[in-house]
Structures are given as structure tokens and as C-alpha cells.
């Protein structure tokens, strides 16, 4: 969870650290992994300390075995640190090949919500029918982190948070960096819904011609080049696709 404004995974770490660790242990057994590494950004130090304490307590109480190695690391807070390829490189210095998967470099990546769901599925036969998400933004009267049943309409979720205020004119699903604009509240929460955000309309920005300085490529963690937007703007949609 590296998107600004989204804090639902952070709340899960504070409220269900034991379930997360036990779920990670089950995932390790299922995949045959030789170690577990938990990465937490350094703006969540209380979650880091809590996870570390619970891990030590579980080992001490023999709730999980001492072996194999399990480590908890603090990572620099930056976007997109939580993206799986970036996370793998930050923790292990392994590069996932273009078009490849983490498994290609001997890694399986799960977020804390998935780890918790694995534990609940095995321990309580509970199917995945709910999702932790953040409802926030200046257009939301009472921002909250919620656990919502999949299929619940955005309208009901927003109403639970005190309905939209008068400034809300933009509604999106996800974090502010990788949003999906929504044109209606009559859409359901899905498995991938990490947040519902509402803002006032943004002031239009003046668009300037690209001088091809390359700074955007240098700043991009994946080295992506801005070709699709340029081709689309030139009416070359098939080439951009």
C-alpha cells in the first residue's frame, strides 16, 4: 500500500497483526518458500514495531515454528514502493524481467489483506466476500477505513460516511496515483477496490509541448517512456495500443 491517502492495509496491520503473520506462514507452506520477508514503509513505524513484536511472541509461544527465517524490514516511504517489482528489488535486489512474474525470480508477493484472508479461509472456512478500503478526500464528510462486502454499491458506502459534501464533483476508485474515474455511485465494490475518493473539480492545467528532456523517464521507477499519450494525441490510437 504505497498510494497516498490509502490507509486500509495500515489499519489491518494495527488491528489484525497475528492473523496476517499466520496467513503469511500458511502461504509459505503452500508455496514451499524458504523465508518470509515483511516490508513496511517507514511512515508506519508503529505497525512495524507491532508486527515485529507479534512475530516474536508467536515464535516464543510456539504458535509458529522458529524456522525458517522471518524478517521485518522498514522501507523508505516513496511511490511506488509497494508495487511488487519495486518491492522485490528493494528487499532482495532481484529484477523481475519485463513481462515476467515474481515467481520467475523465486518470489511470491502477497499484501496484508490477502495474508489475512488466507488465515480466515483456512481457520474459519471463510470465503473472500469482503474488502478493507479507505473512503476519503475533501468531498467526504466523515472519512473512514471500512470492511465492506464485495458487491456493496458505492452509494451505500459513501452514505455510511455521511454522504458527499457540496465540494465533491470528482469520484474515483483507487488511490490518487492510479485512479479509475467513476461517473456514477451505482457501481459495486469489487475485489480490487482499495479506496473510494471524492474531490472538488481540479483547475484545468495549461498543456505544454513535450521538449523530450527525458526527465519523466528518469523519474519513472520502471523507465517507461511517454509514447502512448503522444501517439494518441497525434491520432495514432492503434500504434499507441
Feature map (PLM): residue ranges:
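Cofactor-cradling patches in redox/metallo enzymes
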Residues: 10-18, 42-47
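Histidine-anchored nucleotide/phosphate-binding helix
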Residues: 14-31
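Gly-rich Lys/Arg/Thr-decorated short loops/hinges at beta-loop-alpha junctions or inter-strand turns
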Residues: 1-9, 139
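Short gly/pro/ser/thr-enriched loop/turn and capping motifs at secondary-structure boundaries
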Residues: 2-4, 79-82, 178-180
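Ferredoxin-type iron-sulfur electron-transfer modules in oxidoreductases and energy-metabolism complexes
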Residues: 192-208, 215-217, 221-241
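Glycine-rich phosphate/pyrophosphate-binding loops
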Residues: 28-40, 167-169, 227
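Hydrophobic alpha-helical positions that pack around
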Residues: 34-154, 160-164
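Active-site gating/interface segments in enzymes
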Residues: 88-91, 162-212
